[in-house]
Amino acid sequence: KIIDITKKNKNVIPTVESHKTTMVFTNAGIDDIFYRLWNAGLGECEVWYNDGSEPDGPILNSQVKDMINRGINASAGMLIVNPNARNTAKIGIGNEFFKKGSIQYVGSEIRAVILNKMMVDTQDDVCVIGGESIAIETALLAPEGTVIAVEYSATDRDTMEENVDHFGLQNVKII
C-alpha cells in the first residue's frame, strides 16, 4: 500500500496494521510518528528509510521500537514492513480502549453490528452525529476517507479529540 500523508489526512497506523508493506510519503514536522506506531503495538515492524534529506544518502533499516525518539525532519519516503499484518478489518473495539470522559459508549457488540450494516469502504466520507466510538471505528475503517464527527457538548468534543489523538487518526473533523 502506498500512502501520501503530505496532501490529505491519511491514517498511518490502521494502514500499517492491515498491510504487510506500506510505503509512506511524508513531510517534515511529524515528531511522534514512530512513537505512535510503537504505542499501537507495531514496535516489531521494520522501517526502511533514507538517512538524511539527500536522495543519494544511505538506506537504513530499524525496528519501530528502536525509533520511538525520532521524528521526521525532512520530506521523506519510508517503507514499513509488518510481518504480522491482518487482512481483515477490526470492528467492535472494547470500550476499555477508548478514553473516558463525559461520553457513554455504546456496547462494542452493538457498535460492531452498526459498523457492519454501514459497509464503510476505505475511501468513504461519513458524518456521525453523537456517536463518538462509532466515529472512531469508522475512521479506522475508512483511512482514505473523512469522518465528520458532530458533537454538541464541549466536554464530548474534548473527549472525542482525546480519542482521535489516542488512536492516531488524521481523518476525523470534529464540529
Give residue spans per PLM region.
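Class I SAM-dependent methyltransferase SAM-binding "motif I" and its flanking Rossmann-like core
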Residues: 1-18
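A contiguous loop/helix-start segment that scaffolds small-molecule binding in enzyme catalytic cores
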Residues: 17-101
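Phosphate-coordination loops involved in phosphoryl transfer and adenosine-cofactor binding
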Residues: 19, 122-123, 144
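The conserved SAM/SAH-binding core of class I Rossmann-like methyltransferase domains
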Residues: 50, 129, 148-151
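Conserved alpha-helix/loop element of class I SAM-dependent methyltransferases that forms part
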Residues: 107-122
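Conserved class I S-adenosyl-L-methionine
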Residues: 123-132
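Conserved SAM-binding loop of SAM-dependent methyltransferases across substrates and taxa
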Residues: 132-144
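S-adenosyl-L-methionine
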Residues: 150-175
